[in-house]
Amino acid sequence: FERQQVAEMLWLLNAGNDDGMKEYLQNAASENRAWDGVFRDVILARGDDNDASKGAAGFYKQRIGDLDRLTNDVSVRFFGINVSCAQCHDHPEVSSWKQDHYYGMKSFFSRTFDNGGFVVEREYGFVKFKTTAGEEKHADLMFLSGEVIKEPEAPEPDNKAKEAEKKRLEQFKKDKKPVPAPEFSRREQLIHAGLKPGADGFFSRAIINRLWYRFLGYGLVMPLDQLHGANRPSHPELMEWLARDLVSHEYNLRRTIRGLVLSAAYARGSQWGDSQRPSASYFAVAQPRPLTPNQYGSALIFASIDPENFRPHTIP
């Protein structure tokens, strides 16, 4: 179970073959670390050599140089919302998604950068964008729910202060140490906003939808990255109940997975009678699915490997 869970989480987070991320997720699966804890570790990315969250910074490695990709990936993978359509204009089909939402999410990462392999955050920096009318705006620090987070004044430093900051960062880089987090961290504010009760439940519903898709072959909301009011779940009461249950049991994914695989919906066969096969969204019959590339490759490795060399908590 743990091996497969790590593989699925690597796919979900699109972490590729980053060794640090693999090790982090292996430990998280072994300890049954809560999903909100994984979210915190990944977003903060502050683990050092003696920290259990070491390796979680791997999520940023392929993204830290591209804030637009980082913004949308966090939104898609943790909140089930693809906000990229609201980058250049308000969403054409979802009236609730505005440019303010996209750039509000981007603002959580606008002060984040790499310093000697460490993911660090400075105390200043704002996001500007132009509306379709040509108006230039400063983006508010705004979560997907529309909540605007108040923050202390953070004026742009003068050239002398920037030069001093540059020297300070170089020293941390030479010492191979992380830069201390700012007193007001925008990434910390994202965690608070995302996990806040009543924040439209994006965080809990997104992982429930992905787990349902993983085991049942079709999400309660499809596509998986379109979890918004204009795209209602096929079974809204079930979605809300599962999300509440997950939160009330401290984001214990193993417990939720156990419930799903013991359910009547999961146990259904894939054969149907002579009548028309029902839509996949009814979950009245199992959906035949090919193996994923990862499953197929893993199966070949498992079938051919020497059992004596098969070690627990290792992904070939």
Enumerate the predicted regions with their spans.
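Primarily short, surface-exposed interaction patches in extracytoplasmic proteins
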Residues: F1-H313
